[in-house]
Design a protein with these regions (language model features):
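Structured catalytic core of nucleotide-sugar glycosyltransferases
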Residues: 1-120, 158-163, 175-183, 188-189
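A short beta-strand submotif of the Rossmann-like class I SAM-dependent methyltransferase core
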Residues: 319-325
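Helix-to-beta-strand junctions that scaffold the AdoMet/dcAdoMet cofactor pocket
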Residues: 103-104, 329-330, 343-345
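Hydrophobic adenine-recognition pocket in adenosine-nucleotide-binding enzymes
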Residues: 89, 325, 355
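Conserved N-terminal segment of class I S-adenosyl-L-methionine
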Residues: 221-313, 319, 336, 351-352, ...
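A short glycine-rich, Lys/Arg-flanked "PGG" loop and its adjoining helix->strand segment in the class I
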Residues: 333-348
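Acceptor/aglycone-binding surface of glycosyltransferases and processive sugar-polymer synthases
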Residues: 61-76, 81, 93-170, 197-207, ...
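Hydrophobic helical membrane-anchoring modules
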Residues: 140-143, 165-242, 349, 414, ...
């Protein structure tokens, strides 16, 4: 089935008598195999009977509130794409055709009042309040979306699988968007003209909605600034925090200046950083599906794999980058032997990790954990020092050519694969592994 159209309703009989025939005609003319699902929240005006008379599927809302209605609709949907729109005719059903054409550009298509070309015909108070809310949320969550609160959306159903949300009313629209974007799904807006509802009354209570939206906004802000967000690394490069922005750009400058021109490059554990985006002939490898989804829109060759078993043939690369990866993994000799294996003779290894022997990192890590409790510091399970890291790479057949620091805390080393590895029996103690 191509599409499921979800209509959350409470006492919308008069509007459904107009909307459902128009939707049916639209699906027929577009030659779409689709269904219309009316999710009833306890109507008392004959909405259920009217919808059933039009031959569409009607289900009871499981739970209470707009969020519960949306969740019920997602669970009932059988189409490859899921369309949600208001049943009050403020969302012109004819616009579905334009949204359908845009589906190849992203996983979520939003009918937007505030992107260029979009218009909202409503009273000044509601228009001003809506614009203010959308600007606030867009900036708080750092989303490339101008109409965060639009409920007129087309979702790829595969993106909704496993999606869980806690919001119960209209604030759920922002939560859904943040959670999907944090999982690496792409969003596109198409300009849309909004008109007030045709009949009936709105079910939004501004004060209650405002308080619920504030609570949801804070929860989603924490998610957007956690490692769970697919674009965490890229956002850090453009951070509004000067120190974080400097740190990220210094790391990028050192790593890219060493790697550029190296030939075929592997960024192992690339995350969503700009390093892999900035290098020609680079392949990004990452275990997290969300980060891979995010990077696919940048036209970069990508592979999913583990640092413990790199999914590449021997001697496949001229340069391997491992930036801010090894401290997140339990120490194992195979991490370094795998990087050596996929490097060609004379190939370059660029390693970046905090130096736990420096006073700088001992000061910065507690401060970082306090200010950003969801950040990388909480994920560091293996602590390296410069001395121990040199011992390890030397033992695995690398010669250290150069080392650089960021704020005397983060160590970045450039190493060269030697023709003859140092004998394996020359072992050095492994670095201390502790839970950060």
């Amino acid at each position: 089935m191509d599409i499921s159209v979800i209509l959350p309703v409470i006492n919308e009989r008069g509007n459904l008598d107009i909307l459902i025939p128009r939707l049916k005609s639209l699906l027929k003319n577009a030659r779409l195999d689709g269904e219309i699902v009316v999710v009833d929240g306890g109507s008392s005006d004959g909405t259920w009977e009217s919808a059933a008379a039009h031959g569409v599927r009607v289900v009871s809302e499981r739970g209470k509130g707009y969020g519960a209605a949306i969740q019920t609709g997602f669970e009932e949907a059988r189409g490859d794409w899921v369309l949600t729109l208001d049943a009050d005719l403020s969302h012109d059903p004819d616009f579905v055709a334009k949204m359908w054409r845009a589906r190849d550009r992203a996983d979520i298509v939003i009918a937007s009042r505030y992107t260029r070309g979009g218009v909202a015909y409503t009273d000044l108070f509601r228009k001003s309040l809506s614009r203010l809310l959308n600007v606030f949320l867009r900036r708080l969550w750092s989303l490339p979306v101008r109409d965060v609160s639009s409920g007129y959306r087309l979702y790829r159903r595969a993106a909704l699988e496993g999606l869980e949300f806690t919001s119960t009313n209209f604030e759920v629209l922002g939560e859904i968007l943040v959670r999907l974007y944090a999982r690496g799904y792409g969003v596109v807006e198409v300009p849309f003209t909004y008109f007030p509802r045709r009949a009936g009354r709105s079910h939004i209570r501004l004060l209650r909605f405002g308080m619920a939206q504030l609570r949801s906004a804070l929860r989603m802000w924490k998610l957007r600034n956690s490692l769970e967000s697919a674009d965490y690394d890229e956002r850090a490069y453009y951070s509004i925090i000067p120190f974080q922005r400097y740190w990220q750009r210094r790391r990028h400058s050192i790593t890219v200046s060493w790697a550029r021109g190296a030939g075929r490059i592997l960024d192992a554990g690339c995350g969503s950083s700009l390093i892999v985006q900035s290098l020609n002939n680079a392949v990004g490898m990452e275990f997290n599906f969300g980060k891979l989804r995010f990077l696919r829109h940048h036209g970069i060759p990508l592979a999913r794999g583990s640092a413990f078993a790199l999914p590449f043939k021997d001697a496949s690369f001229d340069c391997v980058i491992s930036s801010q990866v090894i401290e997140h993994l339990a120490y194992d000799e195979i991490l370094f032997s795998e990087m050596r294996r996929v490097l060609r003779p004379g190939g370059m290894l660029i390693l970046g990790t905090p130096d736990y022997a420096t006073i700088g990192w001992r000061i910065i890590e507690p401060a970082y954990r306090f200010l950003l409790p969801g950040g990388y510091a909480d994920e560091h399970i293996t602590h390296y020092t410069r001395e121990k890291l040199i011992e390890i790479v030397t033992r695995h057949g690398f010669a250290v050519e150069e080392a650089a620091y960021i704020v005397r805390s983060e160590l970045i080393m450039r190493c060269r694969k030697c023709d003859l590895p140092i004998p394996a029996q020359q072992r050095a103690p492994s670095p201390e592994s502790t839970a950060a």
